[in-house]
């Protein structure tokens, strides 16, 4: 199922185009900036600049932006930036930030057998968990342990403490490179551990697509018990994760039948450091920024850990975080 976003402009009308972009910025209601430091937008607090950075006013404005943005210019989207490492050489094209505006959070229906919540891509996962608890719905408590937004959780099937995002999804809303909105169901996707891909049999979006919201089906619960479960999860995070330092959460996926943190610790790598990028002594699957780490230092730690763990265990750790952008000069 798909619907077309209503564009509040005449797409055939003459426009005063920006020479640099080929886009009429008068058509936009959001904020477009150039040479934006991405370290301000990612949880590692490191990395280069984005050539362009756009904060849409709302979903309709995002559709307009994508429709007019030059098709040969790269597009990426970000929530709280908790799963990205932007290389020091920066990003071409545009990075679109969703967390400030695509934050609708609605109780769509509530019956004796449960309820349905719609959450926009920019809603923090912990906020969705608390919202569900407030409305006596259970099953979303684990989301309190995910340090990102709904959009990112949908894109990677984020999970923790034995639960995963797509176990609760009834359907999702996506937007493609042309600004067209689509509604899809879990059956349209191949869903696995930290992986979500469209089936080949599903007509593809124009060239790529992004999650802009999702409907979550939850079972009936009790507000107090859910609140206590969320509180317990947050307490566990505080005790076991280095929340006092910039990081991106878990860096590596757990290999089948094992844990990345256990393998890293087994190899004696807790506290391993390059510059200001260090493997946490509290949780071995976290790389923290101890001060002024560069993206290159963080990526070098990642590569070194992968090499050492493989050499000692013959297990190649796969990154859970996304490493994007260009290297600076001759680095790496």
UniProtKB/Swiss-Prot annotation:
Its main location: cytoplasm. One of its GO terms (cellular component) is cytosol. Residues 45-243 form the FAD-binding PCMH-type domain. It is found in: Cytoplasm. InterPro entries: FAD-bd_PCMH, FAD-bd_PCMH-like_sf, FAD-bd_PCMH_sub1, FAD-bd_PCMH_sub2, MurB, MurB_C, MurB_C_sf, Oxid_FAD_bind_N. One of its GO terms (molecular function) is FAD binding. The active site is at residues 194, 250, 320. Its cofactor is FAD. Pathway: Cell wall biogenesis; peptidoglycan biosynthesis. It catalyses: UDP-N-acetyl-alpha-D-muramate + NADP(+) = UDP-N-acetyl-3-O-(1-carboxyvinyl)-alpha-D-glucosamine + NADPH + H(+). Its EC number is 1.3.1.98. Belongs to the MurB family. This is UDP-N-acetylenolpyruvoylglucosamine reductase. It comes from Nitrosomonas eutropha (strain DSM 101675 / C91 / Nm57). The gene is murB.
């Amino acid at each position: 199922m798909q619907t077309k976003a209503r564009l509040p402009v005449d797409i055939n009308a003459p426009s005063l185009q920006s020479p640099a972009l080929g886009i009429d910025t008068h058509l936009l209601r959001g904020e477009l900036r150039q040479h934006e430091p991405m370290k301000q937008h990612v949880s590692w607090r490191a990395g280069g600049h984005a050539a362009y950075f756009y904060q849409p006013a709302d979903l309709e404005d995002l559709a307009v932006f994508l429709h007019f943005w030059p098709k040969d210019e790269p597009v990426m989207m970000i929530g709280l930036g908790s799963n990205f490492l932007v290389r020091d050489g920066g990003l071409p094209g545009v990075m679109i930030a969703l967390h400030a505006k695509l934050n609708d959070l609605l109780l769509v229906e509530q019956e004796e057998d449960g309820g349905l919540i719609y959450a926009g891509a920019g809603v923090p996962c912990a906020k969705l968990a608390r919202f569900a608890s407030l409305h006596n719905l259970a099953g979303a408590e684990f989301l309190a342990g995910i340090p990102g937004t709904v959009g990112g959780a949908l894109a990677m099937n984020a999970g923790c403490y034995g639960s995963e995002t797509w176990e609760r999804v009834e359907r999702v809303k996506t937007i493609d490179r042309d600004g067209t909105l689509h509604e899809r169901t879990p059956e349209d996707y191949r869903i696995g551990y930290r992986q979500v891909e469209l089936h080949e049999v599903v007509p593809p979006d124009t060239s790529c697509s992004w999650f802009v919201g999702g409907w979550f089906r939850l079972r009936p619960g009790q507000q107090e018990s859910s609140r206590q479960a969320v509180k317990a999860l947050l307490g566990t995070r505080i005790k076991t994760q280095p929340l006092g330092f910039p990081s991106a959460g878990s860096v590596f996926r757990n290999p089948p039948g094992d844990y990345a943190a256990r393998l890293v610790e087994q190899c004696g790598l807790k506290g391993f450091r390059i510059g200001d990028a260090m493997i946490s002594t509290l949780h071995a699957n976290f790389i923290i920024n101890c001060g002024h780490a560069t993206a290159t230092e963080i990526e070098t730690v990642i590569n070194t850990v992968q090499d050492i763990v493989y050499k000692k265990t013959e297990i190649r750790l796969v990154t859970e975080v996304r490493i994007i952008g260009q290297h600076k000069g001759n680095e790496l």
